Amino acid sequence: EIRPLVPMIYYHVWDNFPAPHFNRKFYLSNDRICAISKVTRDIVAEVTPEVKLNYVPHAVDSEIFKTLTEEQVLEIRKQHLGKEDQDKVVFFWNNRNARRKQSGSLLFWFKKFLDKVGHDKAQLIMHTDPKDPHGQDLEHIIDHLGLDTQRQVLLSSQKINQGDLAVLYNMIDCTINISDAEG
């Protein structure tokens, strides 16, 4: 038996209510549970109040990732988007280019969206490796769909620091995050 020699700690997430009382025996088999969300913390506290519980936020640094003023956002858009792109609705997809993240499907859906609203009305920024061996060849799909890599779909494949990523999140209008078979 290892438990008398080493404390058992469960780093845990459970995303929604109702509380999974069927997990009680598993929760009790730990000396401490570290919940990565407030929902998980509340669930564990309900199911096993006798188990030591810590809330360990699974999040980003709120000093870096914070909402900027409208004036700051306008200035950032001027600096980072072409003059003809500053009034577009800008979408942002920040994921690994893996099949389960549906990067190729997103490009097809975005093309249909542009066909409906106008090809000069929106832009998609994809922060990913367009040639990831676990994903689709995004450059090929973009070319196949006839999308413009300067105006419609921008690929950002270089590693960037958190400050620059925070700027990107402030500059865009909508974040897209789709995937299949998570967890």
What are these regions (language model features)?
Residues 3, 128, 135-163, 167:
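Nucleotide-activated donor-binding/catalytic signature segment of Leloir-type glycosyltransferases, i.e.
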Residues 3, 10, 20-31:
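A conserved, positively charged/aromatic
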Residues 39, 59:
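Carbohydrate-associated surface elements
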Residues 66-83:
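A short helix/loop element that forms part of the nucleotide-sugar donor recognition site in Leloir-type
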Residues 83-101, 107-110, 124-125:
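Conserved donor-binding/catalytic core segment of Leloir-type glycosyltransferases
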Residues 94-99, 130-131, 159:
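Short donor-sugar binding/catalytic loops of nucleotide-sugar-dependent glycosyltransferases
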Residues 180:
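Aromatic "clamp/platform" in nucleotide-sugar-dependent glycosyltransferases that forms part
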